[in-house]
Amino acid sequence: MPSNRPSQYNRSAINRNTIATVARQDEALRLRRQGMAYIDIARQLGYTPNGVPRPQSAAEAVRAAERREQLSGAALANNAVAAVAATTAVAPVAAAAVANAAALTRTFGVEIEFFGITPRVAVDALTAAGISAASESYNHQTRAHWKIVTDASVTSRGTGCGSGLELVSPILRGANGFAETAKAVTALLNAGAKVDKSCGIHVHVGADGMTGADIIRVVDLYVQNNTHLDTVLAASRLNNGYAMKYNNAAMQNLRNALRRANGVNDIQSGARGLPRYMVVNVTSYLRHGTIEFRQHQGSLNGEKVVSWVKTIIAIMEKGASMQDGDVQDFGSLDAFTTALGLDDQTKTYLNNRATTLAGSR
């Protein structure tokens, strides 16, 4: 996954209601699109409290300008998502995506493991659905297209290549990203792809600009509410060697590694010694600039996948914006999803999913 861009951190002191502030935010966005680093934008535009450049403030300014752009194009986005829904039979997913698009501007990517069809069949199915895709050998390169790669940990039946397969997205964002994700998995399902207990879904969410303390809060928020998230997950993912849960010692190791990390180099240095196969994988920051969430089981159900992605993004948003002492166990799935600010359709889906699974356990 690439160096994605988050959309919310601690509450900013920037006054967004003045012409000067808007102009400075627009200039920050222009500089960022030219490739300038956040710390250099902070220096150039004066985001320097106490004389120290603050890249987080520059990132907030960029996101504020991006949100204005997105809101101004909301009608076009809604029409685009509606058109996708009409042609791919994922209208419920698209409708929920539109409802929450303005709030969910953080970039994300998905990795979805499957088997049952060959890479060629998978690419053809995606292409027929209007999705740019290619089959590639195993790699960690970020592409502008969806890619099909091999995965030795996944059931190989029907793939013709001696291993399972993984669908890896390009960088995605907001309503269009949700709709395209649903469209992609629906295309694979209709082509004959399958999932079983060997398959998982990994969600990467952009973390560029975050501090070590921000990342700790995100992980802590997930961990403290892990039992509530478990209620919507398959039993095979509750104690899984590829997505292990944090115990007290693991959380303390995370805090020790990241609590003083303020910049990219600090976070990379701290994350380097941490374990990868956790429900929340911080080591993905080293290669991709993301935090990876690994717990969800494999699925080719568009509504299920998108509901989980939206939940994960909301956890990133909430954790990054909280104060250290505010992270807590919210007591139930419903209370947690309410605190996350999820849209009603996603909350209803998750609650219904939890009820269904509770009856089978």
Model regions: which residues?
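Short, charged amphipathic recognition helices of the HTH superfamily
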Residues: 33-45, 199-202
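Hydrophobic alpha-helical segments and helix pairs
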Residues: 193-199, 203-205
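Short Lys/Arg-enriched helix C-cap and helix-to-coil transition segments
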Residues: 63-91
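Basic, amphipathic alpha-helix used for nucleic-acid engagement in HTH/winged-helix/SANT-Myb modules
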Residues: 1-23
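Short, basic interhelical loop/turn and adjoining N-cap
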Residues: 39, 44-64
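C-terminal accessory/tail domains of diverse enzymes
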Residues: 81-194, 208-361
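Short, amphipathic alpha-helical "recognition" segments used to contact nucleic acids or chromatin
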Residues: 19-36
